[in-house]
Swiss-Prot record:
Residues 122-125 are annotated as: G3. It comes from Methanosarcina acetivorans (strain ATCC 35395 / DSM 2834 / JCM 12185 / C2A). GTP binds at residues 50-55, 178-181, 213-215. SUPFAM superfamilies: EF-Tu/eEF-1alpha/eIF2-gamma C-terminal domain, P-loop containing nucleoside triphosphate hydrolases, Translation proteins. Mg(2+) 2 binds at residues 50, 75. One of its GO terms (biological process) is formation of translation preinitiation complex. eIF-2 functions in the early steps of protein synthesis by forming a ternary complex with GTP and initiator tRNA. Belongs to the TRAFAC class translation factor GTPase superfamily. Classic translation factor GTPase family. EIF2G subfamily. Zn(2+) binds at residues 90, 93, 105, 108. This is Translation initiation factor 2 subunit gamma. GO terms for molecular function: GTP binding; GTPase activity; metal ion binding; translation elongation factor activity; translation initiation factor activity; tRNA binding. Its EC number is 3.6.5.3.
Length: 443
């Protein structure tokens, strides 16, 4: 099928980039193989519902990531949102005043210079959308934990999201005390001490706490300074075969488009290692479900890359770091409505096997977090359904065998994962999926 170039702003709150990344340290560490036209790092926005995550992304990037119809109507994030932001630096002003997202320094009027581009992953904070948050956490290099100053701390999903960061292994964290314009100084100090007490003994114990107002753009320079210090650009393996976690997929064609106007399916996500170019062959696993003569199996998809975009910027080479939109020659019906979300794309023959079941080593939490009554977590039992997050994939697994520190699960939907891959485990508690621990795939 012939596909035109899919270089457009992707719908669904997804704007995959704006300008150029200029990180000299990263260039040296990768031997100059870093693509200067794409973001360098993925930073997650996490925290309780309505604490200002999406507003903060807007303040940093100019992109309002809630564009899905239900998101607009309900005023909450439902899907993962994405936006890229260039961090600019004034050559004359000292830190933190030197940092801004503007092309002109708001302090001295000097023309600013591009420092680096970051991709923000806006995760929903509602308790019913924990699976979406966990799939977003899989592509985060660091996170901003947003806590509203006008509410008691911690709120249920503040606790659950911090626990998720800890379990998944995200250690580079900045805490934002948002909505400081809505409270008195006394209340602000009280809330600050609540935050300090809450994070004591956690992965975020030593994280800086930055008081801001995303709505009024207060202390945004201080926040950028903290992000530059606390969440460095990671060094990725560009000499390995390309592997990409798919976080979104789209059909970007408008209804009524003619045959000549139809563009191939688009996948969005992050490249974890290797390099991609237009013209490269791409395998996607597990692929598509095919039923013949009463037998069902999953068949990997093989396609060719037609174009690669970091935001509106078309690139001829994509390296790890930040979010990408990859145009393909796939039938767009295969990619519409996030139908390939959770799959892995990469060099044919190099991807992990497709698993319909696996055995995992268990590491359960002591107590359930994110609920009013934090009850003890019981051992996993045979025949119990569990929600499992592996990379950007979410599936349900039925426990077929369980011991104290090990369980075998049969998956409702297969995943592509290697031995040693980490699995976030959630259990149905009070009609909600609650995070109860982490597993490691053994076989």
């Amino acid at each position: 099928m012939k596909s035109a170039d899919p270089g457009v702003k992707i719908p669904g709150g997804t704007d995959f980039g704006k300008n150029t990344c200029l990180i000299s340290d990263y260039l040296h560490s990768t031997g100059g193989n870093y693509n200067l036209s794409q973001p360098c790092v993925n930073i997650g926005m996490v925290g309780h519902v309505d604490h200002g995550k999406t507003t903060l992304v807007k303040a940093l990037s100019g992109v309002w990531t809630d564009t899905h119809s239900e998101e607009v109507k309900r005023g909450i994030s439902i899907r993962l949102g994405y936006a890229d932001s260039p961090f600019m630096k004034c050559p004359k002003c000292p830190a933190p005043q030197c940092y801004t997202v503007e092309k002109t320094c708001p302090n001295c009027g000097e023309k600013t210079e591009e420092h680096r581009i970051v991709s923000f992953v806006d995760a929903p904070g509602h308790e019913t959308l924990m699976a979406t948050m966990l799939s977003g956490a899989a592509i985060m290099d660091g996170a901003v934990l947003v806590i509203a100053a006008n509410e008691e701390c911690p709120q249920p999903q503040t606790k659950e999201h911090l626990m998720a960061l800890d379990i998944i292994g995200i250690k580079n964290i900045v805490i934002v005390q948002n909505k400081i314009d809505l409270v008195s100084r006394e209340k602000l100090v009280e809330n600050y001490h609540q935050i300090k007490e809450f994070v004591k003994g956690t992965v975020a114990e030593n994280a800086p706490i930055i008081p801001i107002s995303a709505q009024q753009n207060i202390n945004i320079d201080v926040l950028i300074d903290a992000l530059e210090t606390q969440i460095p650009t990671p060094v990725h393996k560009v000499d390995k075969p390309a592997s990409m976690l798919i976080a979104r997929s789209f059909d970007i064609n408008k209804p009524g488009a003619s045959i000549d106007e139809i563009r191939g399916g688009v996948i969005g996500g992050t490249l974890t290692e290797g390099v991609l170019h237009p013209g490269d062959e791409l395998e996607i696993r597990p692929g598509i479900k095919v039923t013949t003569e009463g037998s069902t199996k999953w068949i990997p998809i093989v396609t060719t890359i037609s174009s690669i975009y970091a935001g509106p910027t078309k690139v001829e080479e994509a390296t790890p770091g930040g979010l990408l939109a990859v145009g393909t020659y796939l039938d767009p019906t295969l990619t519409k409505g996030d139908s390939l979300t959770g799959q892995i794309a990469g060099v044919p023959g190099t991807l992990p096997e497709t698993r319909h079941q696996f055995v995992m080593e268990l590491h359960l939490l002591d107590r359930v977090v994110g609920v009013t009554r934090e009850e003890k977590i019981n051992e996993i039992k045979t025949s119990e359904p569990l929600m499992l997050n592996i990379g950007t994939a979410t599936t349900v697994g039925i426990v077929t065998s369980a011991r104290k520190n090990e369980a075998q699960v049969a998956l409702k939907r297969p995943i592509s994962a290697a031995v040693g891959a980490m699995v976030a485990i959630s259990r149905r508690i009070d009609s909600r999926w609650r995070l109860i621990g982490v597993g490691v795939i053994k076989s």
